């Protein structure tokens, strides 16, 4: 569960290392976001000469959370870190060309098939 002020690591090669959630999108008073939800983020730490700079405000999709993810078949998934993939604000396609670490099957919608295809492992 991600809320405003949550610090997340970035799971792509866009150049950002750490980002902070500044808004959970999808409702006027929505407090929490889970895997496959889109949030608004601010870049807090980035590498030099990267595609994104510190202080930029972008959209991101959550790919991993520390909070347990319960599936209908009874299985439970949990990750060590909260992670997201940065998205282009207008097209909502990933900025990076590589994804690091596993992503979940919950991202398998029309919007995020690009992330699924770039990921090394889908759980």
From Swiss-Prot:
Cellular component aspect of the GO annotation: cytosolic large ribosomal subunit
Q: Which InterPro entries match?
A: Ribosomal_uL14, Ribosomal_uL14_bac-type, Ribosomal_uL14_CS, Ribosomal_uL14_sf
What PROSITE patterns does UniProt report for this protein, alphabetically? RIBOSOMAL_L14
What SMART domains does its record include?
Ribosomal_L14
Which key words are in the record? Ribonucleoprotein, Ribosomal protein, RNA-binding, rRNA-binding
Per its record, what are the GO molecular function terms? large ribosomal subunit rRNA binding; structural constituent of ribosome
Among the record's GO biological process terms, what is one? translation
- Record's HAMAP family? Ribosomal_uL14
Q: Which family does it belong to?
A: Belongs to the universal ribosomal protein uL14 family.
What is this protein's function per UniProt?
Binds to 23S rRNA. Forms part of two intersubunit bridges in the 70S ribosome.
- Subunit details: Part of the 50S ribosomal subunit. Forms a cluster with proteins L3 and L19. In the 70S ribosome, L14 and L19 interact and together make contacts with the 16S rRNA in bridges B5 and B8.
Name this protein carries in UniProt: Large ribosomal subunit protein uL14
Gene symbol?
A: rplN
């Amino acid at each position: 569960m991600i809320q405003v002020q949550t610090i997340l690591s970035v799971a792509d090669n866009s150049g950002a290392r750490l980002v902070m959630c500044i808004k959970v999108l999808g409702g006027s008073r929505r407090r929490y976001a889970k895997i496959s939800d889109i949030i608004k983020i601010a870049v807090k730490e980035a590498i030099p000469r990267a595609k994104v700079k510190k202080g930029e405000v972008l959209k991101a999709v959550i790919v991993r959370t520390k909070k347990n993810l319960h599936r209908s078949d009874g299985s439970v998934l949990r990750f060590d870190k909260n992670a997201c993939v940065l998205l282009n604000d207008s097209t909502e396609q990933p900025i990076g060309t590589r994804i690091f670490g596993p992503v979940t099957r919950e991202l398998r919608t029309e919007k995020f098939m690009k992330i699924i295809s770039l990921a090394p492992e889908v759980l």
